[in-house]
Amino acid sequence: MHQSKENEKWLVTNPKGNHALAVGLDNFINVKIDGSTGYYCAGMNKKASIQVNGSVGPGVAENMMSGKLIVEGNASQYAGATGHGGILVIKGNASSRCGISMKGINIIVKGNIGHMSAFMAQSGKLIVCGDVGDSLGDSIYEAQIFVKGSVRSLGSDCIEKEVSTKHKHQLEQLLDESKINLKASKFKRYGSARKLYNFDIDNLSKY
């Protein structure tokens, strides 16, 4: 795959849960994986469009730079971690720590996500159409979180924020690109209260 010409198409069959499939791609190619994968599928992706017709193990799209990844099933923990760009669409549920330390990636989850998601998330958008576990957005920076369902609890320095017309437009664009037919008006927005950016001894118990 790494020597592929632009717009080439690849089909991977019977992946059998193997690890590190379609990792480090750096060209405008299309990859379809028919089946479920193990750890780190599509990690460090750049430019490529990838579709997984199954579920994925931990670390899918870790440190993704650009391109698009669609997961038709569920994703294990820390999906999209440290991602700098591109779009990750998970049609099922995502486990804990989804989008931790994200740095520009857009993550759309049609189902639910687990605890500690968007921990130290710096930029980008995390969109959840279902429910969210404990400690959402703990120590978050400037990433934006949109949730349609319930949130069990918010992490340190994460608060609910107003959804402006601009935010609704951005949300509608990403939902449309993900082929998810939901109204932006049904979502709540969460982000940083910006109180823990600099260490203050009076806030010690909040860290």
Task: Spell out what each predicted region is.
Residues 1-9, 19-29, 39-48, 59-66, ...:
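Beta-strand repeat architectures
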Residues 96, 102-104, 108-111, 115:
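Glycine- and acidic-residue-rich phosphate-binding/metal-coordinating active-site segment common to enzymes
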Residues 1-21, 91, 110, 115-116, ...:
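Intrinsically disordered, low-complexity terminal regions
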Residues 13-15, 34-36, 43-44, 53-55, ...:
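Feature marks extracellular polysaccharide-active and adherence modules
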Residues 29-32, 48-51, 118, 131, ...:
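N-terminal hydrophobic or amphipathic segments with adjacent small-residue motifs
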